[in-house]
Amino acid sequence: MRVTELYGKKRPVVSMEFFPPRDDSAAAKFDGIVDKLADRTPDYMTVTFGAGGSNRDGSYQTVKKLVKEKELPSVAYIAGYGLGPDEITTVLDNYKELGVETIFVIRGDKPRDENFAPHPESFDYASDMIGFIKDRYDFTLGCAGYPEGHLEAESLDKDI
């Protein structure tokens, strides 16, 4: 499912966003919630991705559950800050194998862990990661930005 196909229709598009469950108890609740929400026939579900890839397996498992078990159209996030090109490629290869066609690309927040060290080839900007992905994959890509300028930007002019 490519999200862009939905927005050409003359009706509201409804999506629901999920954070990957953090433990078995949350996973059990997640299943019940997804089943109830699926009855509302959302157009697609999105699944977030932890800072610095901190919960990337949880994100993958959640997307896998939505796509393979629940048969729900899903969009996977990828937050590339801290990840190297090989790690991003692995994540995207896994999503491609699941049949995911739309990826939501964000730089992502810096992890709160003061000992966190980003990969030396980490992407500092989502726009750089989008170029990397477009050169290698046929995903439909979405992204988010800061119209007022990013908090870490030197100036709005340089940010734009």
Outline where the language-model segments fall:
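Alpha/beta enzyme core
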Residues: 3, 9, 13, 22-45, ...
